[in-house]
């Protein structure tokens, strides 16, 4: 994989010289090999090592090169046709029954996204570079953006959106860690991290500029929901006191033992 990384990094430095007609065969093959590695889960855009999330920038480079060097073409989806550069993950794929993934009609998964066994997709959308781990449910009309990382046993409720992050290359993707619940119509975007075991209420919107207020500590932070947080939508007064600014409010933090005994509705109501 080291050789592949070197080829992609060098190609990216000269990306402006490539078109669909002029990309050298060696680079073309390296791009497609990288997309295949992402597609089957052997490579991830980001991975947690020693408690820290690290981004594989070269894998993001490969996706951007893929967009640049692939021609537009027609894809037969059985019930209709699509015209795009990136094929669907399961187009003409006889391995789908062996993948252990349940895909309900009208769910869309792009090539280069990985779905672990025992995941369920209701009619939803999963973009290239995304990683969805085992036991996760992507509910109706939920979206998982490019390169987003979704952990084990996560529930993305109806209409929830997990934002994609391809550029800048060094930016972390949006990350939802294991055992999280993301409420209906909530949006977690711009590389925000929701740590293990957190519960996000319906209609919570969190980007990098969204104040995250911890009711217990009275701290305001940005870009990260700590592990075990129970979060609801709210607002904080502006510095001049003339208006309120939308905020995400951490009403409490709970451990795994507490969460296993208490329903999600009870956790949210107690706030």
Curated annotation (Swiss-Prot):
GO terms for molecular function: 2,3,4,5-tetrahydropyridine-2,6-dicarboxylate N-succinyltransferase activity. It is found in: Cytoplasm. It is an enzyme of class 2 (transferase). Its EC number is 2.3.1.117. It comes from the Bacteria. One of its GO terms (biological process) is lysine biosynthetic process via diaminopimelate. InterPro entries: DapD_Trfase_Hexpep_rpt_fam, Hexapep, THP_succinylTrfase_dom1, THP_succinylTrfase_N_sf, Trans_hexapeptide_repeat, Trimer_LpxA-like_sf. Keywords: Acyltransferase, Amino-acid biosynthesis, Cytoplasm, Diaminopimelate biosynthesis, Lysine biosynthesis, Repeat, Transferase. Disulfide bonds: none annotated. Transmembrane segments: none annotated. Pathway: Amino-acid biosynthesis; L-lysine biosynthesis via DAP pathway; LL-2,6-diaminopimelate from (S)-tetrahydrodipicolinate (succinylase route): step 1/3. GO terms for cellular component: cytoplasm. Belongs to the transferase hexapeptide repeat family. HAMAP family: DapD. NCBIfam families: dapD, PRK11830.1. This is 2,3,4,5-tetrahydropyridine-2,6-dicarboxylate N-succinyltransferase. It comes from Coxiella burnetii (strain CbuK_Q154) (Coxiella burnetii (strain Q154)). The gene is dapD.
């Amino acid at each position: 994989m080291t050789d592949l990384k070197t080829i992609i990094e060098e190609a990216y430095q000269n990306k402006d010289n490539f078109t669909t007609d002029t990309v050298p065969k060696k680079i073309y093959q390296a791009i497609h090999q990288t997309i295949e590695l992402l597609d089957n889960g052997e490579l991830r855009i980001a991975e947690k090592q020693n408690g820290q999330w690290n981004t594989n920038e070269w894998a993001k480079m490969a996706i951007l090169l893929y967009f640049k060097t692939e021609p537009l073409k027609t894809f037969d989806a059985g019930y209709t046709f699509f015209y795009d550069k990136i094929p669907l993950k399961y187009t003409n794929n006889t391995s789908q029954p062996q993948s252990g993934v349940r895909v309900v009609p009208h769910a869309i998964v792009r090539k280069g996204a990985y779905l672990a066994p025992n995941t369920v997709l209701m009619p939803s959308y999963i973009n290239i570079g995304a990683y969805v781990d085992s036991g996760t449910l992507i509910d109706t009309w939920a979206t998982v953006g490019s390169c987003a990382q979704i952990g084990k046993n996560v529930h993305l409720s109806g209409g929830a959106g997990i934002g994609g992050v391809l550029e800048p290359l060094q930016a972390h993707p949006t990350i939802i860690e294991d055992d999280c619940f993301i409420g209906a119509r909530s949006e977690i975007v711009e590389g925000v991290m929701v740590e293990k075991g957190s519960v996000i209420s319906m209609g919570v919107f969190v980007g990098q500029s969204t104040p995250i207020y911890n009711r217990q500590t009275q701290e305001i932070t940005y870009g990260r929901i700590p592990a075990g947080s129970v979060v609801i939508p709210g607002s904080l007064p502006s510095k001049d006191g003339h208006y309120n600014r939308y905020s995400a409010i951490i009403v409490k933090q709970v451990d795994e033992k507490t969460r296993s005994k208490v329903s999600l509705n009870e956790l949210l109501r107690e706030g």
